[in-house]
Amino acid sequence: LRAALIREVTLLLDDTPVVAARSVLPLTSLTGANRSLGHMGSRSLGLELYKRPTCQRDQVWARIGSPAEAMPVCWGRQSRFIKRGEPLLVAEYFLPALWEKVGATSVSSGLL
């Protein structure tokens, strides 16, 4: 069992929750140049992961599940990133409101 920082955020579109995300950052990954990842506050982790050449996604898994208790079952993806040689895990669940906003309700309801 390894100690980790857990970061949970909800992304909004027009003040409506559309993505629930959870990041797991092992404390051993939050040293040296990666230390800033442990102090992101409300800043976007995605900008840090996709903007920097020192980070790459090395594995992606599709998921069907609920991001939290009392939340609907929905599609998601889980990604493992390597940043400066250290791993971190990001799970994103695409809430039904996202599909409704983009006019693709069959994706959220027809496949589950």
Residue ranges and their predicted role:
Residues L1-L112:
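Composition-driven recognition of glycine/serine/threonine/acidic- and proline-rich low-complexity segments
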